[in-house]
Amino acid sequence: MSDLSAHTPMMQQYWKLKNQHPDQLMFYRMGDFYEIFYEDAKKAAKLLDITLTARGQSAGQSIPMCGIPFHSLEGYLAKLVKLGESVVICEQIGDPATSKGPVERQVVRIITPGTVSDEALLDERRDNLIAALLGDERLFGLAVLDITSGNFSVQEIKGWENLLAELERLNPVELLIPDDWPRDLPAEKRPGARRRAPWDFDRDSARKALCQQFATKDLKGFGCDKLTLAIGAAGCLLTYAKETQRTALPHLRSLRHERLDDTVILDGASRRNLELDINLAGGRDNTLQSVIDRCQTAMASRLLSRWLNRPLRDLKVLQARQDSIRCLLDSYRFEKLQPQLKEIGDIERILARIGLRNARPRDLARLRDALGALPELQNAMTELEAPHLARLAAITGTYPELASLLERAIIDNPPAVIRDGGVLKAGYDNELDELLAISENAGQFLIDLEAREKARTGLANLKVGYNRVHGYFIELPTKQAEQAPGDYIRRQTLKGAERFITPELKAFEDKALSAKSRALAREKMLYDALLETLISHLAPLQDSAAALAELDVLSNLAERALNLDLNCPRFVDEPCLRIEQGRHPVVEQVLTTPFVANDLGLDNSTRMLIITGPNMGGKSTYMRQTALIVLLAHIGSFVPAASCELSLVDRIFTRIGSSDDLAGGRSTFMVEMSETANILHNATDRSLVLMDEVGRGTSTFDGLSLAWAAAERLAQLRAYTLFATHYFELTVLPESEPLVANVHLNATEHNERIVFLHHVLPGPASQSYGLAVAQLAGVPTAVIQRAREHLGRLETTSLPHEQPAAHKAKDAPQVPHQSDLFASLPHPAIEKLGKLQLDDMTPRQAIEMLYQLKNLL
């Protein structure tokens, strides 16, 4: 709103502030409430389910309004942040008692989904990331910031495909893009995408701002000096963070250069299908992390999630982690460390809040307890001889001076906020103790003073009192007023009484009337000074937090290795993937019966397995467990297998299951083909590829042709491939492609019911058991019976598919029979004969039916 002259002074002040933040909800402090006006009020009332009302008039119109009590702010903020909204907090900074006109107000905080730091607004086991993006169709600079930990990274990525896969991995809650980019770009479709002015991405300004933030002359030390696009994106992020926090950011100390080549790349479909930390329903149950995460601290859980979503190809790092896990397993050393690690808590985020100067008293109490636990933990770590663990121990250190300071300063169980005081211990500051004593002991002082004055003057009717208008006084009956001592100064005359004050009482009054407010101000000043002291030690404290989080993850992986029967994989130079008695780590935990372990062997002689077998026979489980074993190996973990030998892989692809993409206007088959195309374009001879039921979303012959061609292409690429299919024609591929082999999941039928044995055996399956699975699923008996009739008719009249000429050799494998859906219909007599229920017929009925059948011939 530009013309403010018609508004009241209060609303003029409001609009001057609101015009600076047009796209964010403004919470405007008025006394004990945050008021919300105009369109913000209508939106907030709906989102928060609070009453919308009106507040008088301004500019001739009533003002839509809603409000919340100031002490309930955090709960409402949490709800709005979860809904993706941003909120501007506008506080009163002037004194209402001395202000002429509206009390002075200013914006003190801007809360956005990506820049929140309050514990109540965060998921403790998930990173809360904000990203910025700059580039063109060919090359992109991506910067990512977690303001709750100080982790700040940059990278440059080629092409939309790789960029979208990386955004899927990071899942930032906010994504900043230049306002001059074309509309409807793929990145803008992500939730939380926000446009920023192009000058926020200026590369020269960004470089200067980053060097100033890190107190360096250039960015060469971070290995990203030449990443101009990423630097522009990082500069935008830094500006945005400072704009929202309204304070310096001392906990942002460095910039990490990430490279896709250092990682095993998983696209979005693969992450979803493997259910690493989010299941297909969007929850966390029955995910890989739910099984392998028994970390003692939330910061370690977040680190483990980062490892799972960013497996490494750096053999030195992986072997260092393996050695650390072995060391922690030796003599069950992890059991001694884990209870001590639990005492550390989430100091990573506590330190970030200290850096942002919004740490709460309970944050400092938790930091005090963590620092107090470090010496005992440090002693336990001296026994760990693994080189990587020794480095972590050296980084961790101890902080006796800070621990002592916090022990002297913070009471055992402090209140949630500093606002009302009661945080600092007695004895920490003499002036504060005196002010608190005056405030808390005023009543006793007056009682003692009255007793002393009665004794001094001999006036038994003397009283000491207080009222808000005249303050403290000594009261005497009018008849005794003339006997008042010389140091009594007349203050007030009443009917029948005179009130006096003495120099001693006046001095006490001056202290007492302001003692409480002065005590609160003094305590806040001391608390802020305490934060500044901690900020001066922030760098080593953050390094210690990172080391402790990694120690926690490694201890957790050792505990999981012991209790889940995991074994150390061995990386080799020879291209291979050999697994003995491999298991699915998640399925194994939910089964009530023993899990059937299986072997897998892929090397230079066999690069692809064609997997056949019945639905529910275990094909998808076998494929997924292979991918999870490979992924766990690439985070340095032990794996669910008796043994595992593998070479480093560059990518893991999964095309398992599909659903349509209604929002994107794509059918199930289109989604399936898009995922297949991505695999065929990007897979290499170092990639692991899982393909399940390719081609099932279209007609039989189209689907078979596509599946066949895709399998041939993957065989030619020499990718490590598990190709599950119900197209039995594909089982002849080994005859034309020497790197392909057949395996199947076995099953048997007993009393017309299927029994899944889940063993992976060489060769193709003999049949698909489709009707048996349908019966197991509860399809009505009549429908199953009718299906058997149709199946019998089709198998009786169909012609076998002719094999390609290349596969007609006499030693070609026997392909299980597939029905020809286009064969001629059976003779009516045969069809009627197939429907007969012979066990229900009498001899006479059987003879009559025989004559009827003869007449049909």
Swiss-Prot record:
Protein name: DNA mismatch repair protein MutS
Protein's gene: mutS
This protein's GO CC annotations: cytosol
PANTHER family, A to Z: DNA MISMATCH REPAIR PROTEIN MSH1, MITOCHONDRIAL, DNA MISMATCH REPAIR PROTEIN MUTS FAMILY MEMBER
Extent of the signal sequence: none
Reported function: This protein is involved in the repair of mismatches in DNA. It is possible that it carries out the mismatch recognition step. This protein has a weak ATPase activity.
Stretches for region Disordered: 797-820
NCBIfam families noted in UniProt: mutS1, PRK05399.1
Any one GO molecular function term: damaged DNA binding
Lineage, broadest ranks: Bacteria, Pseudomonadati, Pseudomonadota, Gammaproteobacteria, Pseudomonadales
Family, as annotated: Belongs to the DNA mismatch repair MutS family.
Any one Gene Ontology BP term: mismatch repair
CDD domains linked to this entry: ABC_MutS1 (cd03284)
Domain of life: Bacteria
Pfam families xref list: MutS_I, MutS_II, MutS_III, MutS_IV, MutS_V
Binding sites annotated in the UniProt record for ATP: 613-620
Keywords attached to this entry: ATP-binding, DNA damage, DNA repair, DNA-binding, Nucleotide-binding
